[in-house]
């Protein structure tokens, strides 16, 4: 949520800021702005809406070598130009951008800023006024004023600050909100995400919580809040420019759906050797072996991926698995087993709710594993272990390939642990072969795009409500499928256990209500789900069936290639991703950037 870009040095700041903000669009935002300094000429431009709206307001005179930019996701105050970042101090000397939530901003306003007039309603504007006060009224240096403000501010933040009287320096600080330093020759940068700067550099430096950084064109100074200088190594970001472009695709989501066979094969090559043996960190395997219960913590699609993997993990490892909504566990952690193991699923590795749980786990001495798509992310740094998805950047807000990669990665992990335990099911499960078949199954489904699009047009083009139903693993797929549909088509959709229809939900079925039935697993389960489908059809529902090969009957709508039952949640989810995509497309919506949603939820 939100994005920060900043640059100081021998570069065209305006171009870098705008290109960086465009690369951060996927994070979600409702307004944007930039500040650029060129000697005594200062330019501040802000806009509500898309980056294109901001670009249209920027004239050729908005140029300079130092600047900061921001995409805002409204938390305090509505989406207005006044509330858009960057914000300025009372005298306009200081300019600030901020991601996060300042929890004590009202107390700061009352205690320190009586008599100050504000242009908007944001917590950020109060922070920059406070810094300005400490310099211009209390006589502190800029660095001391910034440190003083940081000692007062409570909550999550990533700050980038410019003093217009010394615009060759950017002051940076973070706490519980992602921020990176990008390193160049004759210039340095700050950004929320490496993708924002990958055109300019591949060299980055991490900033840890409660650290302050002073950036000039030739230097990067890292300090703790006591002013002690810290040493920090840089690292090379493994990103390719081709990975973050759409190519010939109209939307990132369709590109990412199509990339899933490649992702499956990438995971095979990463987590198995040439003989087909599992190549998982032995320390991770040993830690899970020693656990008496696995707790999977996640949010959104990652939470659904955890559910889709639960039965597989239990059957392969003989270890009970519990799922937890990270945002709830952060405040109300239940009674745990004697030897718990936490697995945190997060595409971005920056999910604030999951991090809150991880902080508690670390305090309690509970071992943890982060399964993420982003190396060097906060969750990967702070967990005991990390397992990467190797899915490549996922730009579309609605997650697709990260979901299937999470299920596949957990399959590799489960097989490795099961083999170490001598579990027969794990020893006999040829995961490399079976996942190769999954990749082929995905390709077969992707070849049926026209069929799926035509089914969607008949069923979902004008509806306001829809339901997915399934049993067993199909129920877990139904949860993810319904989330995907509601995210990008704005159709009120729910995924239900088919057997629960009679316990209340069937009262919502009326003439024309779309119901999508998912059928895989055994003949018995399939028969029961078909019975539920008949029940809703008898009450006027418009039914679409997605069926695994071998369980299909004449009249079924979409047939998916049969794969191993442990991996069926991957094969069955692919048509539902396409259903969501075409429903959004046919409604004329922005598939990649649905309203009110952010790719990385970095505030609690």
UniProtKB/Swiss-Prot annotation:
Database matches in Gene3D superfamilies: Glucose-6-phosphate isomerase like protein, domain 1, Glutamine Phosphoribosylpyrophosphate, subunit 1, domain 1
Keywords for the protein's UniProt record, in alphabetical order: Aminotransferase, Cytoplasm, Glutamine amidotransferase, Repeat, Transferase
Enzyme kind, highest EC tier: transferase
Main location: cytoplasm
Catalytic residue positions: 2 (nucleophile), 599 (for fru-6p isomerization activity)
One GO location term (cellular component): cytosol
Alphabetical list of InterPro entries matching this protein: GATase_2_dom, GFAT, GFAT_N, GlmS/AgaS_SIS, GlmS/FrlB_SIS, Ntn_hydrolases_N, SIS_dom, SIS_dom_sf
Disulfide linkage: none
Domain SIS: 284-423, 456-594
Record's catalysed reaction(s): D-fructose 6-phosphate + L-glutamine = D-glucosamine 6-phosphate + L-glutamate
Protein name: Glutamine--fructose-6-phosphate aminotransferase [isomerizing]
Gene of this entry: glmS
């Amino acid at each position: 949520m939100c994005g920060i870009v900043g640059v100081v040095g021998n570069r065209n700041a305006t171009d870098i800021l705008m290109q960086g903000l465009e690369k951060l669009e996927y994070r979600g935002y409702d307004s944007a702005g930039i500040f650029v300094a060129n000697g005594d000429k200062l330019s501040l431009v802000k806009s509500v809406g898309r980056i294109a709206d901001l670009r249209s307001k920027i004239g050729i005179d908005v140029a300079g070598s130092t600047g900061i930019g921001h995409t805002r996701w409204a938390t305090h105050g509505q989406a207005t130009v006044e509330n858009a970042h960057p914000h300025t101090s009372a005298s306009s000397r200081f300019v600030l951008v901020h991601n996060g939530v300042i929890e004590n901003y009202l107390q700061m306003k009352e205690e320190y800023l009586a008599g100050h007039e504000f242009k908007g309603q944001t917590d950020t504007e109060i922070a920059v006024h406070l810094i300005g006060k400490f310099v211009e009224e209390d006589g502190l240096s800029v660095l001391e004023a910034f440190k003083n403000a940081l000692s007062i501010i409570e909550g999550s933040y990533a700050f980038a600050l410019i003093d217009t009287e010394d615009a060759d320096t950017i002051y940076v600080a973070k706490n519980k909100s992602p921020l990176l330093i990008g390193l160049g020759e004759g210039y340095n940068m700050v950004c929320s995400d490496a993708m924002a700067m990958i055109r300019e550099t591949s060299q980055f430096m991490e900033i840890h919580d409660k650290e302050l950084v002073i950036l000039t064109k030739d230097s990067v100074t890292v300090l703790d809040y006591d002013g002690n200088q810290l040493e920090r190594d840089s690292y090379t970001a493994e990103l390719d420019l081709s990975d973050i472009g759409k190519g010939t695709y109209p939307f990132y989501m369709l590109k990412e759906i199509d990339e899933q066979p490649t992702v499956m094969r990438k995971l095979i090559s990463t987590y198995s050797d040439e003989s087909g043996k599992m190549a998982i960190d032995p320390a991770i395997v040993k830690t899970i072996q020693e656990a008496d219960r696995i707790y999977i913590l996640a949010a959104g699609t990652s939470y659904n991926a955890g559910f889709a993997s639960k039965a597989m993990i239990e059957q392969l490892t003989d270890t009970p698995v519990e799922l937890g909504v990270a945002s709830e566990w952060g405040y109300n952690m239940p009674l745990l087993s004697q030897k718990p193991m936490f697995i945190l699923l997060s595409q971005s590795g920056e999910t604030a709710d999951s991090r809150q749980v991880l902080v508690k786990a670390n305090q309690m001495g509970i071992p943890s594993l982060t399964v993420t798509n982003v190396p060097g992310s906060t969750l990967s740094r702070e967990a005991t272990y990390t397992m990467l998805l190797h899915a490549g950047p996922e730009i579309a807000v609605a997650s697709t390939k990260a979901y299937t990669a999470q299920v596949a990665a957990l399959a590799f992990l489960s097989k490795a642990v099961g083999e170490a335990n001598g579990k027969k099911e794990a020893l006999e499960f040829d995961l490399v072969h079976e996942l190769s078949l999954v990749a082929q199954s995905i390709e077969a489904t992707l070849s049926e795009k026209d069929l799926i699009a035509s089914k969607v047009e008949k069923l979902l083009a004008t509806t306001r409500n829809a339901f997915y139903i399934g049993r067993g693993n199909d129920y877990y797929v139904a949860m993810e499928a319904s989330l995907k549909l509601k995210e990008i088509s704005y159709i009120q959709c729910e995924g239900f256990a088919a057997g629960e229809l009679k316990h209340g939900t069937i009262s919502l079925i009326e003439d024309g209500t779309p119901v999508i039935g998912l059928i895989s697993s055994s003949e018995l389960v399939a028969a029961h789900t078909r019975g539920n489908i008949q029940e809703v059809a008898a009450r006027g529902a418009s039914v679409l069936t997605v069926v695994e090969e071998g369980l299909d009957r004449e009249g079924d709508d979409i047939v998916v290639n049969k794969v191993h039952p442990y991996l069926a949640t991957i094969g069955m989810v692919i048509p539902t991703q396409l259903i969501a995509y075409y429903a959004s497309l046919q409604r004329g919506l922005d598939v990649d950037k649905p309203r009110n949603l952010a790719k990385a939820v970095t505030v609690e």
